[in-house]
Amino acid sequence: MAAATMSWDDGKHMKVKRVQITYEDVINSIEAEYDGDTHNPHHHGTPGKKSDGVSLSPDEYITDVTGYYKTTGAEDAIAALAFKTNKTEYGPYGNKTRNQFSIHAPKDNQIAGFQGISSNVLNSIDVHFAPLPSSSSSSSSLSQANKVDAQGGKGGTSWDDGAHDHVRRVYIGQGDSGVTYVKFEYEKDDKKESREHGKKTLLGAEVFEVDPDDYITSVEVQSDRIFGQDTEVITSLIFKTSKGKFSPPFGLEGSQKYELKDKNGGKLVGFHGRVGGELLNALGAYFAPSSGRGTPSATQPPGSAQPTGSAGAKKLEAKGGNVGNPWDDGPHEGVRKVYIGQGDSGVSYVKFVYDKDSKEVPGNDHGKRTLLAPEEFLLEYPNEYITSVELNYDKIFGTEGEIITMLRFTTNKRTSPPFGLEGAKSVLLKEDGHKIVGFHGKAGADIIHQVGVHVKPISK
């Protein structure tokens, strides 16, 4: 029995922002987002196994839609769609057939909305036309932004998130050969928007969160030519912020290394790139002049963070091996939870949960989890606080530089068990009359090399 068909109409809008389709033999569903629409996204149909789509930059609009269709059973179905904008062409997404139709916007008009008929497949599609968006409707962020070319391979389908006010979170998914999936959470005009590209795997996605008073200044992109691929693919991404905070490397080392960075030292406010099949081929970025928000204090070195709880905080030097990528959670109001993961050689992973305005604030993951679940040290916050950290470190065969082998935490009430094994060297991180309110250090791909702390005077 054929599925019931339903007519739908998204109406006319200021501009199309994003189109996403899912498909198998034919298109199963279509989803669209529009500028200035409070009901985003508009979804029609049932999900298919494959997904593709396009995100338009703020100064980009659709001028043409080309469709391919076929007859399945007693009904026609759209098998593929392609989109042409004032900048480039996207698609076809789906499976091309011999039957083709095209819709072209009249002069000085754009395609600003979709309508059609759907069942469990997309049966037909039509459009609404509207005058071209005025230049003033494009984001002021975009007009000031510098677009840095995408680095990596030349293949894949282009996507462009455009420029925003801030980048708040980055999600990275990995597969056997490289980076398969990226998702970015932006802030624009005090509203949150997210864009995703590629395909998640069973491994899920790792997260890099940017503090409210911080911003990304550069991205290290590594790429390589992988067997079975026609072009280079992205194998690893590392993000750096204005506070000297580094993400762990998301992925594996590649033969080519690039840096996405603004020559004028601007803040990263958007991404663009190319994705092909199940791998990310290239990544580029938009940079805008940095405002006061997220800029390091003139009296504070760039390597130290300044979250809300930073008043009166002091940064104690990290101890351990002098290799790996720096990371810094910055000072907070207190520490609520500690998570320690161990590997064959030493401490492989740390994560700290802090307090801000009596709410839990998770820090970023540092290092890499192993099959052994992380151990947890819970504090009876706010009555309990950490006063010192004992760390052991050693040079282990096969590792680059010394690594942390053990951590032990002392509070105003008790001492934790040792997390790890004794090392050749031991050091105590402590400042008399102070409590620990944050952590920093250095980490490799799957090991912790250094740990340091932020401290604040204990209030009476």
From Swiss-Prot:
Residues 133-143 have a biased composition (Low complexity). Keywords: Acetylation, Lectin, Repeat. Pfam families: Jacalin. Residues 34-57, 133-162, 291-334 are annotated as: Disordered. Disulfide bonds: none annotated. Belongs to the jacalin lectin family. This is Jacalin-related lectin 36. It comes from Arabidopsis thaliana.
